[in-house]
Amino acid sequence: MKMFMAGSMMIHKTFLRNNHREPVRLLVSYAYRKKSPKILHESKQVFKGYNVEEWILDSGAFSVYAAEQKAKVGKQSEYGESIDHDHYIEYAKKSAASHCFGLDVIGDPEGTKNNLEREWRCGLHSIPTIHFGQATQSRIDWAKSGPANRIAIGGVARKTYKERL
């Protein structure tokens, strides 16, 4: 089984600086990188000097969703801006990520499906996300029909270990 470490770029670099012997796999969030003028076109340049085996691009939909929830109660977050789907598609195409996750729509399985099908038509092999509690057989069959040959399970970030099982 392959494991990918998620976290901010600062966490990644701190971890990599202190654990440089073993190759690592990273999950990089578009929500945190979208404002960067530098496209992640070469993982070797971005992670220069670190032993990064591969990395996956995540849409960051949950980060944006969580920021929107904070904004509703008067708290601010720099990641609360919505994600421009066209920009995400182009960003993913230009990146050197080994895989990318589709732009899921929290609480809207049909919106998630529409986004994924658009990404697939644009040539991305985006990994579909099926959120916790929304896994119907038809949704699983649809996700399996895509080009990624993988399925992600979403909606578990705030679940306990027992709930995730």
Where are these regions (language model features)?
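Non-catalytic, usually N-terminal nucleic-acid engagement modules in DNA/RNA processing proteins
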Residues: 1-114, 125
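Glycine-rich phosphate/ribose-binding loops and adjacent secondary-structure elements
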Residues: 126-165
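Conserved anion-binding
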Residues: 111-134
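Short, surface-exposed basic-aromatic patches at helix termini and helix-loop junctions that form
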Residues: 20, 117-121, 143-147
